[in-house]
Amino acid sequence: MREKAKLKVARRFRKNLTEPELWLWLRLRDRCEGDPVFRRQHPIGPYILDFYCPQAKLCIEVDGADHTRDARIIRDATRDAWLAEKGIRTYRIYAGDVIEDADEAANGMVLVALERIAARR
């Protein structure tokens, strides 16, 4: 997909977040001073990441039930490997966990990002 077309798709995704993605985004965008910055529906290479923290080189993916199917597992592994080659770690969180406690899920994402930032220094 060309960069311009991918950016257009990412913009459309930003306007149509899933419910768990929206709940996380509302918490991540209202971060405290000193917390890492996250981008939503961030295009990188051939992919669009649910959330991306550039300081931590951390991709956060919110996985629904479809991510347990064999074909999707293989696609996710291929994507994770491609990102790892670029130095980007993928952290996957189940959508049901976000629905159960979005605050805890968002805090967990921030902690993972902070740990990764500290380890990169």
Tell me the role of every PLM-derived stretch.
Residues M1-R121:
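Nucleic-acid endo/exonuclease domains
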